[in-house]
């Protein structure tokens, strides 16, 4: 675990210390679909393609979850691109439930 002010990074390493994957969470003041404020948010997670579907991502999420429970949090939130169905399925496999869908807008100035 690597900690910053409101960000924490998690590394999954092989026995020889080569990286298998990483995840980053931050504490947000608000996140769509979440009930608590502030709320921990899974900003990103990446697993080496050779090690996907072997429990590395689940282990990272479980480690994060345990730490957050110890800190008194009651939920972990995340997001995924609306077209990324693979990510939706992985999130569900890790115990996340979809809360809402949002369309973002931008105006060029």
Residue ranges and their predicted role:
Residues 15-21, 86, 99:
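Glycine-rich acetyl-CoA-binding "A-motif" of GNAT/NAT acetyltransferases
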Residues 36-49, 103:
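Conserved acetyl-CoA binding element of GNAT-fold acetyltransferases
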Residues 92-101:
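Conserved acetyl-CoA-binding loop of GNAT-fold acetyltransferases
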Residues 76-87, 106:
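Conserved beta-strand-loop-alpha-helix junction that forms the acyl-donor binding cleft
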Residues 11, 18-27, 41, 46:
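Conserved beta-strand in the GNAT
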Residues 61, 68-80:
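Conserved GNAT acetyl-CoA-binding A-motif
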Residues 1-14:
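Active-site rim helix/loop that mediates acceptor-substrate recognition in acyltransferases
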Residues 43, 47, 53-66, 89-93:
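Conserved acetyl-CoA-binding loop-helix of GNAT-fold acetyltransferases
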